[in-house]
Curated annotation (Swiss-Prot):
GO molecular function, one term: rRNA binding
Any Pfam family: Ribosomal_S19
Family of this protein: Belongs to the universal ribosomal protein uS19 family.
Classification via PROSITE patterns: RIBOSOMAL_S19 (PS00323)
Organism listed in the record: Parafrankia sp. (strain EAN1pec)
Protein's recorded name: Small ribosomal subunit protein uS19
InterPro entries listed in its UniProt record: Ribosomal_uS19 (IPR002222), Ribosomal_uS19_bac-type (IPR005732), Ribosomal_uS19_CS (IPR020934), Ribosomal_uS19_SF (IPR023575)
Described function: Protein S19 forms a complex with S13 that binds strongly to the 16S ribosomal RNA.
Gene Ontology, cellular component aspect: cytoplasm; small ribosomal subunit
Record flagged with keyword RNA-binding: yes
UniProt cross-references to NCBIfam families, sorted A to Z: rpsS_bact
Record keywords, A-Z: Ribonucleoprotein, Ribosomal protein, RNA-binding, rRNA-binding
Any one Gene Ontology BP term: translation
Amino acid sequence: MPRSLKKGPFVDDHLLKKVDVQNEKGTKHVIRTWSRRSTVIPDMLGHTIAVHDGRKHVPVFITEGMVGHKLGEFAPTRTFRGHVKEDRRSRRG
C-alpha cells in the first residue's frame, strides 16, 4: 500500500541534511548512506549516493526516472551466481 499523499515522501533527516548542504555549496561529492528506506526526491537529482547493500556501498547516480522510488531498489542485496550446469556423464539411464 502506498504512502498517504498528505504525509509526503519519507527521507531520513541526516540524508536530507547532507543533500541540502551540498546543494547550497554547489558540490557533488559522493554521499554514503545506510538508509535504503529513503525515497528519492527531486533535490537529489545529479547527486551520487552510495547505498549500503549489506556488504559494501553501491554508488547510485540519481536521475529523473528514479524520483519517487526508494534508494534500496537500486542496490541489490543478493547475488545470483547461476544454476549449476548438470554433467551429462553422471546421468546414466
